[in-house]
Regions:
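Charge-dense, helix-prone N-terminal extensions
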Residues: 1-114
Length: 114
């Protein structure tokens, strides 16, 4: 999945928007309203090689994904229990990435806090 495809997919979810609270090199995708800061559901380190995509994840699934894929790591500068960082090398198939993005969106949409 290219950066543009990823960006377009992340913004295709209802009530999502792009923010840069950590600077221009980190794209933060949020659900909610800008007036209330929203809830993060995805982050992309735009300048990293390979790209790094961080997503919220169920803690048990997080551990399983890390066992299956060497490019799935504990969340970079995030809760290691509730976030994974995926190095976008092609190891994780695009269909699975889309599924993980959907899960992250759903978790953030229903989350009371991070």
């Amino acid at each position: 999945m290219t950066l543009k495809e990823l960006h377009d997919y992340l913004l295709s979810f209802p009530n999502t928007w792009l923010d840069f609270p950590f600077g221009e090199e980190t794209s933060v995708y949020k659900i909610g309203y800008a007036e209330t800061s929203g809830k993060m559901f995805a982050l992309i380190a735009d300048k990293a090689k390979p790209l790094r995509l961080s997503l919220k994840c169920d803690p048990l699934l997080s551990e399983r994904l890390r066992e299956v894929y060497e490019t799935v790591l504990p969340g970079y500068h995030l809760s290691k229990k509730h976030w994974n960082t995926i190095l976008l090398t092609g190891q994780v198939p695009d269909d699975e990435l889309r599924s993980l993005i959907q899960m992250s969106y759903n978790l953030a949409a229903g989350a009371k806090s991070d």
